[in-house]
From Swiss-Prot:
Protein name, entry field: Glycine receptor subunit alpha-1
Effect listed in the UniProt record for changing residue 137 to F: Abolishes sensitivity of channel activity to potentiation or inhibition by Zn(2+)
Function: Subunit of heteromeric glycine-gated chloride channels. Plays an important role in the down-regulation of neuronal excitability. Contributes to the generation of inhibitory postsynaptic currents. Channel activity is potentiated by ethanol. Potentiation of channel activity by intoxicating levels of ethanol contribute to the sedative effects of ethanol.
GO biological process, one term: startle response
């Protein structure tokens, strides 16, 4: 009986003990503070009750804000020589520290916020100095990222498409290497308030497999500082330089090879018979007109610049060779017809000599007429140049050299035709050799010498 009462007492004490412990835990749980919701935390961090003012930069009246920039290139293309600009799609990332946004109340080390929160914080006033046109991307939502870290670091990323100016030097076109720049500058804050700098690692990144239609984007990229001095102060500026080497495959197929074939086609005229005037003239005029059209087409996609380009020299020399081939036939035709002119000249000369000889003979045979022979003057003396007579008492004493035998018209014709054919034979070798020498100098200068000068710059 005694042991039963003792057991009941022990059980009662145990129940009371656990009941009191449970009630204390419940009371402690009710009295513990509730965890802060994300909305309450953001209101406390940057809301109206936080005292945060987005109009005031971090470290106001203190050291300047250092903004680290990084660019990721999604696409690079639409390089236009006529307007001298290029189009690029990038992720622009900016990082800076805002001590007012540091927190300890929230468990996460970083917060990825909605883009609408960007209006609630201070942001750098970055703009692209050489920008000609730009737009944001809003499909399917605003392509913007805002991330705040526990220590107050802010990451702001945005996707934009830019059309940037790119002054080009086209002297070596289409074997040129262009350098296009991208300048990032502060619009309103001077260097006393804001400083841009490139990220130490991977400041400019390029998407894998990025290719350009006519250019090769070189891996080395120059990152520079370009501080701007204006009347309103000294402003921070950084720039990236992209080196673009043109691939001339398109121009080789569309311009160089066709013009080369036209020049070679004009040389066929040297193998056509010189008597086939319609064929040779038609071929010459056709090649000249075709070369002129080809030259005009090469300039259609290029700006009107004051200097001479490599393609201009090529087209001008090709046109010169084609035109020279046409002039060569004019020379051949002229030389081949010279025997007719010479025969016509001889006939005229004989026609003028005959009346004079008849006159002298009549004077010598007629009675009572003055005889020049008595004074040693005959027709030969009268025909002497400048009226000077031959000395001697008697004309018979004067010895005249025998006249050179004149060639027959057929021999003269063959002589001049041989001269014309010789011009054709020389042209068959001379024109290709001259064009080959020009090609050697042209390609050596523009592919080796000029390229080394560009790389040295």
């Amino acid at each position: 009986m005694y042991s039963f009462n003792t057991l009941r007492l022990y059980l009662w004490e145990t129940i009371v003990f656990f009941s009191l412990a449970a009630s204390k835990e419940a009371e402690a749980a009710r009295s513990a503070p509730k965890p802060m919701s994300p909305s309450d935390f953001l209101d406390k961090l940057m809301g109206r009750t936080s005292g945060y003012d987005a109009r005031i930069r971090p470290n106001f009246k203190g050291p300047p804000v250092n903004v680290s920039c990084n660019i990721f290139i999604n696409s690079f293309g639409s390089i236009a020589e006529t307007t001298m600009d290029y189009r690029v799609n990038i992720f622009l990332r900016q990082q800076w520290n805002d001590p007012r946004l540091a927190y300890n109340e929230y468990p996460d080390d970083s917060l990825d916020l909605d883009p609408s929160m960007l209006d609630s914080i201070w942001k750098p006033d970055l703009f692209f100095a050489n920008e000609k046109g730009a737009h944001f991307h809003e499909i399917t939502t605003d392509n913007k990222l805002l991330r705040i870290s526990r220590n107050g670091n802010v990451l702001y990323s945005i996707r934009i498409t830019l059309t940037l100016a790119c002054p080009m030097d086209l002297k070596n076109f289409p074997m040129d290497v262009q350098t296009c720049i991208m300048q990032l500058e502060s619009f309103g804050y001077t260097m006393n308030d804001l400083i841009f700098e490139w990220q130490e690692q991977g400041a400019v990144q390029v998407a894998d497999g990025l290719t350009l239609p006519q250019f090769i984007l070189k891996e080395e990229k120059d990152l520079r500082y370009c501080t701007k001095h204006y009347n309103t102060g000294k402003f921070t500026c950084i720039e990236a330089r992209f080196h673009l080497e043109r691939q001339m495959g398109y121009y080789l197929i569309q311009m160089y090879i066709p013009s080369l074939l036209i020049v070679i086609l004009s040389w066929i005229s040297f193998w056509i018979n010189m008597d086939a005037a319609p064929a040779r003239v038609g071929l010459g005029i056709t090649t000249v007109l075709t070369m002129t059209t080809q030259s005009s087409g090469s300039r259609a996609s290029l700006p009107k610049v004051s200097y001479v380009k490599a393609i201009d020299i090529w087209m001008a020399v090709c046109l010169l060779f084609v035109f020279s081939a046409l002039l060569e036939y004019a020379a051949v035709n002229f030389v081949s017809r010279q025997h007719k002119e010479l025969l016509r000249f001889r006939r005229k000369r004989r026609h003028h000599k005959s009346p004079m000889l008849n006159l002298f003979q009549e004077d010598e045979a007629g009675e009572g007429r003055f005889n020049f022979s008595a004074y040693g003057m005959g027709p030969a003396c009268l025909q002497a140049k400048d009226g000077i007579s031959v000395k001697g008492a008697n004309n018979s004493n004067t010895t005249n050299p025998p006249p050179a035998p004149s060639k027959s018209p057929e021999e003269m014709r063959k002589l001049f035709i041989q001269r014309a054919k010789k011009i054709d034979k020389i042209s068959r070798i001379g024109f290709p050799m001259a064009f080959l020498i020009f090609n050697m100098f042209y390609w050596i200068i523009y592919k080796i010498v000029r390229r080394e000068d560009v790389h040295n710059q």
